[in-house]
């Protein structure tokens, strides 16, 4: 049960990251965000297909570099938002970017830590389920919340 659930979570997260990369195509800085989401999509897909891949030196190196990159960028965005935002951060494009970076970082750290036990323990699996559900529930909430979407720039309104 646990191996199948871990693989399913990785499959769903790979789909989420791929979809997130896809919806960036009309963003002013699309080339950056497509890469930021495509890297975890591929890394996560590989984990879903073969959980033992997290022990591979190339997988570990790429994931560690991406974790570092996303963490540094997230800290910068968080600082920016802390000083400039006066409403819900999800109303700001930078807030949505920050939440994407946090999801990427959390998921890749979870996968990275699974190299000792590719299927994960109960706690790791519970965390995986929560992280997997979060972006999908958030997207549904944002899609339903017309007030939140009304303040978005045009390029955010014309995607899925």
Curated annotation (Swiss-Prot):
Keyword field: Membrane, Transmembrane, Transmembrane helix
Protein name (Swiss-Prot/TrEMBL): Transmembrane protein 220
GO cellular component: membrane
Gene: TMEM220
UniProt cross-references to PANTHER family, sorted A to Z: TRANSMEMBRANE PROTEIN 220
Organism whose genome encodes this protein: Homo sapiens
Transmembrane segments: 3-23, 30-50, 62-82, 100-120, 125-145
Topological relation to the membrane, as annotated: Multi-pass membrane protein
Keyword Repeat recorded: no
Pfam families: TMEM220 (PF15071)
UniProt KW DNA repair keyword: no
Compartments, record wording: Membrane
């Amino acid at each position: 049960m646990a191996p199948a659930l871990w693989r399913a979570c990785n499959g769903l997260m790979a789909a989420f990251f791929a979809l997130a990369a896809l919806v960036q195509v009309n963003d002013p800085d699309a080339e950056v965000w497509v890469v930021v989401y495509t890297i975890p999509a591929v890394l996560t897909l590989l984990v879903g297909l073969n959980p033992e891949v997290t022990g591979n030196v190339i997988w570990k190196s790429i994931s560690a570099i991406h974790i570092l990159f996303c963490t540094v960028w997230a800290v910068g965005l968080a600082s920016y938002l802390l000083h400039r935002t006066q409403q819900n951060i999800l109303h700001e494009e930078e807030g949505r970017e920050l939440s994407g970076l946090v999801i990427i970082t959390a998921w890749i750290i979870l996968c990275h830590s699974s190299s000792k036990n590719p299927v994960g323990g109960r706690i790791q699996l519970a965390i995986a389920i929560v992280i997997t559900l979060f972006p999908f529930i958030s997207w549904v909430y944002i899609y339903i919340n017309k007030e939140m979407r009304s303040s978005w720039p045009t390029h955010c309104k014309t995607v899925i």
